[in-house]
Amino acid sequence: MMNWNQLISAKRFGMEEFHEERQENRSEFQRDYDRLIFSAPFRRLQNKTQVFPLPGSVFVHNRLTHSLEVASVGRSLGDDVAKALLERHPELQDSFLPEIGSIVSAACLAHDLGNPPFGHSGEKAISTFFSEGKGVRLKEKQPNGEQLSPMEWEDLTHFEGNANAFRILTHQFEGRRKGGFVLTYTTLASIVKYPFSSSLAGTKSKFGFFVSEEESFRKIATELGLILLNEHPLKYARHPLVYLVEAADDICYQMMDIEDAYKLKILTTEETKELLMAYFSEERQEHLRKTFLIVNDVNEQIAYLRSSVIGLLIRECTRVFLDHEQEILSGTFEGSLIKRIAERPAAAYKHSVEVSINKIYRSRDVLDVELAGFRIISTLLELMIDAVTSPEKTYSQLLIDRVSSQYNINSPVLYERIQAVLDYISGMTDVFALDLYRKINGNSLPAV
């Protein structure tokens, strides 16, 4: 059984021997939040696709605005859960339990840092390059004798943004300090939705850390008392706060995708209202209709409905977490919080997901971005991987010289060189990736 006193630690990854209490008003977890907000990888999220093409005449969500909204919802979830837990466990009043809102909020900011350009099509382009594309050749022993281990190969064929985020936050890149972002152990553990290695990824290609960061996660998990479920391959029970980060993400992406689809006229006003009203009881729906007689601006009505649904889902997910606290602490809770909410909102949420799949994610604009992104990422990967596996070629060196010095592109280890390419490409914005693709293909030249 995990316990709250051990689960919430202010110890910083990479600075364990230097840990000391700071004389300032900010808590260590608020420092995590601020450190993320001011980081370059976080800023780059403003030019990474969430779902819809960027930018357009109608401003829609990108990865940055999405992450900020998830952090806001995550803070509310964390604060509500902390308040209830302190009433339930008054002996924890002097612990870090009141900081749950700050921890979840910081973890929410970081949850998408590892996503490559062009949304999920970028992730798919990377994994399929190795499983189906020209990267397949790397599974075999190379002419110079280099060979990837089975676990390294699993990492590549199941490339996952969540695992990549953990790498960005913890890996010591060239010329950078030990511990990556040097975040607290608890914030780091709270972003790992799938706390197991890639060999357990299965058909959904979900896992929490690459083999290169396995020992880092093991260190964090041991410190926080996460339950070890399997040694080889490595698998732990989730940190309890992961459920709150996941719930905040589930709430936001579903609500914001619907709102964006409405703004882009993929969904009509009536369709949007119907989707959102379905979350509420008949009595509450009647109250909302009366409110709309006063607030007759349609956009304001949709925004009010959206915020009301978010409030409802926060209360529901908080209730589910508290109802199942013991299962969560024992590592036996299965599924997500959103899947355990009350019947009416659960049915409305399920219907929202179905509409999103059928009408939003399959809309022409969304598919066009996915197709273009897949092509761009695949091409960049093909050229860059060829460069690091055949560096003796003249053209290879030209490509290698483009890569930032923080990436270990000249490592003597094949896996590390491939990872350096993935670090470089996954860190690109949509615009940077497109610009590089055009230049490499001779479709664009630098202005003189």
Where is each model-derived feature located?
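Sequence-structural signature of the catalytic-core scaffold of metal-dependent phosphohydrolases
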Residues: 1-25, 37-48, 57, 68, ...
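Acidic, low-complexity proline/glycine-rich segments
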Residues: 30-43, 341-345
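A short small-residue
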Residues: 48-58, 355-360
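Low-complexity, highly charged intrinsically disordered N-terminal segments
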Residues: 61-64
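Hydrophobic (often cysteine-bearing) scaffold residues that line and stabilize catalytic clefts
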Residues: 66, 118, 122, 161, ...
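Hydrophobic alpha-helix feature that most strongly marks membrane-spanning transmembrane helices
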Residues: 252, 256, 260, 314-326, ...
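Substrate-recognition/cap regions that form aromatic- and gly/pro-loop-enriched pockets
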Residues: 322-404
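C-terminal amphipathic alpha-helical interaction region
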Residues: 390, 394-445
